[in-house]
């Protein structure tokens, strides 16, 4: 079941973009969307969660740069598929990883040597009420983005938004430096403006279960000059 809280801001944003098709043209792109969608691991065993980091999907099969912005525009919403951990699993994660499940978007500007700089953040959202569903959050304020930037998922505590047991050609990166990939409880989220972090750690056979809604910048309609007689 898909839930869509606070639809009004998203509906208004999309309506504003599409209201004048004769004057300008914009696309709506779901960044990161692939079919079939991945299923988060919880409550199955092992019930694994994304924890205390910022991450993005690097590859799914032959598809690379899955979370890279394809065109200039604005991010207006994001969607996350959540597993449904049991009561004991939820309590375990809450106790070990800093509290209630929550997440937000982070926009990254990739730099050299697997480093990325934080450009913007979405509002943090509590996820527990939506366990077992796919939920869409409209942003209170849309985020302007540029082609080549990356949409990442920031999880300050934990989120049951990880599909596991996939092929070795599927992988995601986290904002953890060399030598720290096994440490998934230390806080490494990238939440400060202009913060630079290294995305050294690559986790194979797993997929982050989120996407982001991009409304591209409108392109003025081209008109054919009228021919003059004579």
Predicted regions and their residues:
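Bacterial N-terminal signal peptides that target proteins for export
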Residues: 1-11
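Bacterial N-terminal signal peptides
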Residues: 11-21
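Sec/Tat signal peptide C-region and signal peptidase I cleavage site
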Residues: 22-26
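Aromatic- and Gly/Pro-enriched, solvent-exposed loop/edge beta-strand patches characteristic
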Residues: 27-47, 96-192
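Short beta-strands within extracellular/lumenal beta-sheet-rich domains
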Residues: 50-70, 134-137
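Extended extracellular/luminal ectodomain segments enriched in beta-structured repeat modules
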Residues: 68-88
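Compositionally biased low-complexity segments at domain edges in trafficked proteins
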Residues: 185-221
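Extracellular mucin-like PTS domains
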Residues: 221-228
């Amino acid at each position: 079941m898909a839930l869509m809280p606070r639809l009004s801001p998203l509906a208004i944003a999309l309506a504003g973009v599409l209201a004048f098709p004769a004057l300008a043209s914009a696309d709506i792109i779901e960044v990161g969307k692939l079919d079939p969608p991945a299923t988060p691991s919880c409550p199955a065993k092992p019930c694994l969660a994304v924890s205390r980091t910022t991450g993005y999907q690097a590859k799914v099969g032959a598809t690379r740069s899955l979370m890279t912005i394809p065109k200039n525009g604005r991010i207006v919403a994001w969607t996350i598929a959540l597993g449904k951990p049991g009561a004991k699993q939820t309590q375990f994660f809450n106790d070990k990883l800093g509290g209630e499940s929550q997440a937000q978007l982070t926009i990254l500007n990739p730099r050299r040597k697997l480093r990325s700089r934080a450009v913007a953040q979405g509002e943090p959202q509590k996820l527990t009420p939506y366990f077992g569903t796919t939920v869409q959050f409209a942003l209170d304020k849309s985020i302007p983005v540029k082609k080549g930037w990356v949409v990442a998922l920031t999880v300050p505590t934990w989120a049951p938004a990880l599909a596991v047991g996939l092929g070795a050609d599927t992988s995601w990166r986290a904002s953890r430096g060399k030598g720290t990939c096994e440490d998934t409880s230390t806080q490494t989220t990238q939440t400060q403006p202009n913060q630079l972090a290294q995305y050294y750690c690559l986790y194979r056979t797993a997929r982050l279960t989120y996407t982001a809604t991009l409304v591209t910048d409108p392109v003025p309609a081209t008109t054919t000059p009228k021919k003059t007689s004579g």
